[in-house]
Amino acid sequence: RWYARMARVMGASMKQEYPGTPQEAFATGEEGSIYGSRIMALRERGRVGVEFEADPDAPTFTAWDLGLSDHTAIWLVQIMGDSFHWLDHYAASQQPLAHYVEKMKDWEKNHGVAVTFHLLPHDAARRDAHGISYVENMGRLGLVNVRVVPRTTDVWRGINTLRELLERSFFHARTQEKARGFCGEEEPGGVEHLELYRSRPPGVGGAIAESPVHDGHSHTADAARTFAEAWSHGLLHGTGNGRERGRRARMW
């Protein structure tokens, strides 16, 4: 029972921490990384850092995290047949909502796509001191095609859903590009944030931490999980799947 619980939390990294074979013992990966083994496998298959075109006819989504201390992270994703194409990533802090709305408009223009839905976490429906929600403020700024993803009661369920989706994913080269922080410091790109998102080590007596480490990498990881949870809740159903509406992106 303990091993099953640990495997649920740690995913493929369980093999490095608690190996069953010598090969598993010497497998590489960021210690405690939640998505690291998936990203590593994608790299080995040539699916990270790929150059491909966005499909203007494919279902297109943004997935958000509205983090603590005014941090916001957003992914741009297309569904292409049975695959998920992660086109772009953006993260910033100490910016007004209008800044992010303008970024969404820039994405649509620069990538030649129309966003089907902007997927926001549950706290976007929370009302501020003036009785206005984040979603309503977005609408006032012209972003009306919004879906709020219900709050999950189990963060690991969403994490495991994202692990499954990652196995069918491609990441554009721009999602690896370094970013600049509010003070001009260099920050990791989207893919690197996913690789560095990690679980807490077991406590005294092997007690399992109930939540991952919350740090500068968790905002981008949580935004990706927003997409996965929207998928599992069926919020993307009925939008087509790329096989019906689009064509597979050309890669070179």
Stretches with model-predicted labels:
Residues 219:
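Histidine-centered active-site/metal-ligand motif
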Residues 11, 67-68, 96-97, 187, ...:
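Active-site-proximal structural scaffolding
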